[in-house]
């Protein structure tokens, strides 16, 4: 039997890690030889989740072609967000809830993408369709992913399907959603001990009309906890622009209590962000009122503006 590795995107978040583990558990129950791995360090929110449910973190890998010939992707599809040697392996399956971009294969594959708030919402359907029982632990992980990606159902990406899935998973995991959810989000929003690199850890790269754009996001309970370190943050953003040849680096600092954000933009195309949101950046900073979702309120808007 051919072994498969399953993983989410670089700079993994809670959905990426929990989806990889959950997908692996589903496939193992069906007799597959599969292992969940990760492409980066855990953030503090995900570390809290794994500790809470007493789950070992997936193994960290830099490359995959040296181990396997087949992989499955969760929570992403875009090539630049995936493992560096993705072109050297065969992608046999994708389960995702993002746009499809910069992705093609030479062979047919299982591809499932749905416009929901979280990958594990789709995975719960797959467990049920295949009549595989969701364990208490895996239910806790899947619930945590939904809470994370939907900001406890406050994000505009959240659908009724996500809410229904969360209720079902909470019953299996024996977790009270609101109290656990706030505890989990606050664990991720504590930036007091984070390095500057860790503040920018949740970053994704996109190709927008032949422009290289990186968008990082962090959730906080007070944006000033990050803005007080703006000089250090901007220095690292600038270095990333040089190292990666980026046209734009946008850092979205989201207050999970007010559901507003502040943006820091650096690069040759910052005017695109100003046009997209009708704001003016002063010392690289501007308010982004009501913006909480990179997937729904940042990526598509910037993509459309770059295309003008």
UniProtKB/Swiss-Prot annotation:
<dbReference type="GO" id="GO:0005737">
    <property type="term" value="C:cytoplasm"/>
</dbReference>
<feature type="binding site">
    <location>
        <position position="149"/>
    </location>
    <ligand>
        <name>Mn(2+) 2</name>
    </ligand>
</feature>
<feature type="binding site">
    <location>
        <position position="97"/>
    </location>
    <ligand>
        <name>Mn(2+) 2</name>
    </ligand>
</feature>
<dbReference type="InterPro" id="IPR001667">
    <property type="entry name" value="DDH_dom"/>
</dbReference>
<dbReference type="GO" id="GO:0004427">
    <property type="term" value="F:inorganic diphosphate phosphatase activity"/>
</dbReference>
<feature type="binding site">
    <location>
        <position position="9"/>
    </location>
    <ligand>
        <name>Mn(2+) 1</name>
    </ligand>
</feature>
<keyword id="KW-0464">Manganese</keyword>
<dbReference type="InterPro" id="IPR038763">
    <property type="entry name" value="DHH_sf"/>
</dbReference>
<dbReference type="Pfam" id="PF02833">
    <property type="entry name" value="DHHA2"/>
</dbReference>
<comment type="similarity">
    <text>Belongs to the PPase class C family.</text>
</comment>
<keyword id="KW-0479">Metal-binding</keyword>
<dbReference type="InterPro" id="IPR004097">
    <property type="entry name" value="DHHA2"/>
</dbReference>
<dbReference type="GO" id="GO:0030145">
    <property type="term" value="F:manganese ion binding"/>
</dbReference>
<keyword id="KW-0378">Hydrolase</keyword>
<dbReference type="InterPro" id="IPR038222">
    <property type="entry name" value="DHHA2_dom_sf"/>
</dbReference>
<feature type="binding site">
    <location>
        <position position="75"/>
    </location>
    <ligand>
        <name>Mn(2+) 2</name>
    </ligand>
</feature>
<dbReference type="InterPro" id="IPR022934">
    <property type="entry name" value="Mn-dep_inorganic_PyrPase"/>
</dbReference>
<feature type="binding site">
    <location>
        <position position="15"/>
    </location>
    <ligand>
        <name>Mn(2+) 2</name>
    </ligand>
</feature>
<keyword id="KW-0963">Cytoplasm</keyword>
<protein>
    <recommendedName>
        <fullName>Probable manganese-dependent inorganic pyrophosphatase</fullName>
        <ecNumber>3.6.1.1</ecNumber>
    </recommendedName>
</protein>
<feature type="binding site">
    <location>
        <position position="75"/>
    </location>
    <ligand>
        <name>Mn(2+) 1</name>
    </ligand>
</feature>
<dbReference type="Pfam" id="PF01368">
    <property type="entry name" value="DHH"/>
</dbReference>
<feature type="binding site">
    <location>
        <position position="13"/>
    </location>
    <ligand>
        <name>Mn(2+) 1</name>
    </ligand>
</feature>
């Amino acid at each position: 039997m051919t072994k498969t590795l399953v993983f989410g995107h670089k700079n993994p978040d809670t959905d990426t890690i929990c989806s990889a583990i959950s997908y692996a558990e589903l496939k193992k129950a069906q007799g597959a030889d599969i292992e969940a791995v990760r492409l980066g360090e855990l953030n503090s929110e995900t570390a809290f989740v794994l500790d809470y449910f007493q789950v070992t973190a997936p193994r960290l890998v830099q490359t995959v072609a040296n181990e396997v010939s087949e992989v499955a992707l969760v929570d992403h599809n875009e090539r630049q967000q995936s493992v560096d040697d993705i072109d050297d392996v065969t992608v046999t399956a994708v389960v995702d809830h993002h746009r499809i971009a910069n992705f093609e294969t030479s062979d047919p594959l299982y591809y499932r993408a749905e416009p929901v708030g979280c990958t594990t919402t789709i995975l719960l359907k797959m467990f049920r369709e295949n009549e595989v029982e969701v364990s208490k632990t895996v239910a806790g992980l899947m619930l945590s992913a939904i809470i994370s990606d939907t900001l406890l159902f406050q994000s505009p990406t959240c659908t009724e399907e996500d809410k229904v899935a969360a209720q079902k998973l909470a019953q299996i995991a024996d977790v009270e959603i609101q109290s656990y959810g706030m505890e989990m989000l606050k664990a991720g929003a504590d930036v007091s001990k984070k390095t500057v690199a860790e503040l920018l850890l949740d970053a994704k790269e996109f190709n927008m009309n032949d422009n290289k754009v990186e968008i990082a996001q962090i959730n906080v309970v007070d944006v000033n906890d990050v803005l007080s370190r703006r000089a250090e943050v901007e220095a690292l953003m600038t270095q990333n622009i040089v190292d990666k040849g980026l046209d734009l680096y946008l850092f979205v600092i989201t207050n999970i209590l007010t559901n507003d954000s502040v943006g820091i933009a650096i690069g040759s195309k910052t005017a695109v962000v100003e046009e997209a949101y009708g704001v003016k950046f002063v010392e690289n900073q501007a308010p982004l009122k009501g913006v909480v979702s990179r997937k729904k309120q940042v990526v598509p808007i910037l993509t459309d503006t770059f295309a003008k």
